[in-house]
Structures are given as C-alpha cells and as structure tokens.
Amino acid sequence: MAGNGVSTSADATWIGIGGVTSSDLIQTGTDDTVTASGQVSTIAFYELLPASETPIPSMTVSPGDAMSADIANLGGTAWRISLADVTRGETFSINVTYNSTLSTAEWIEEDPSFARGGLVPFDNFGLANFTGATATENGAVTTLTGAGAQAIIMENSHGQAIATPSVISSNGEGFSVTGGG
C-alpha cells in the first residue's frame, strides 16, 4: 500500500450477509488506513447496519495478514460472527442478535465511508485475495460459481477502474481484487 502524498486514505476488506438488495447488512473484516506518507494501520471490525462498525481491539492485525471470516445464522435472529488472523493465530467470536433478510452473501474490497457521510479517499491497496468463499443455505453449500456471483468493478468519478475483481478460480471459491487506477 502506498500513501497518496496528500491525505489519509483507506480501504476495507470484508464478508457480509445482506446489503445489496436490502438495507440490512451484517459484516466482519478489516480496515486499512494509510497516511499521506504511506504509514499503514489495520483494524479488525464487525458491523450490524444501521449501527457503525465496532472495532475488535483484542485482535492485533498487521497489513497483509491472512484473515479468515465466518458469519453464521444460528436460527432466527441469532448470529455468530467469527474472525481469525491466520498469520498471528488470533481469533475472535461473538454471538449477536440481528434481523436479516438473508438476501445476499458478499465478499467485498471497498472504499469505506466517513461516519458523517462521504467516501474516505481510496488507497491503492495492491491485491486482495479471497479464497474458500462459500455460502450455506438450508444445509446446502454453494460456491461463488454455483451462486452465480456477480463481479463489481469500482470506478472513480472519471470512470477509471480503481478496484477490479478477477475471474472466479477454477474451484469456484476464490478471486482476487486488484487496486489502482
């Protein structure tokens, strides 16, 4: 990751349930913040919209750490959010209550928003890899390919790609996102 030389920038990498076709979203992942000079800090978080994200201070995440995430519906409005820093061997899990439409499953690399609205300047995160991406519904495991996953290219206000997903891997469970633009 490189600083832009002007201002603080950021990116977020997460998985979630809901949010594409509904206003509900339960998610967990990491946020990277990059100073103008290129100093990077990373935090782990979870979020239940419409509330703001909740940092996970018990996890010490470094930029580039391999992460594993799982969001499991335990029945009705009961959920378990699990996040692990595979590189460091740290884990976090919390049970929450949340009303979800279960409308979509998501694997996202994005430009986060300020709490007061508007987008944080987007950093050039390089490459984000997603592997083992599956969703389970009614006991049936579905891959990205099996679910008909749709790639979304993030563009800036000039129509230039700033985050571009790859094709889905041959096993149907992975892809990468390349930053820059």
Question: Model-derived features: where do they sit?
Answer:
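Exposed, interaction-prone regions of secreted/extracellular proteins
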Residues: 1-181
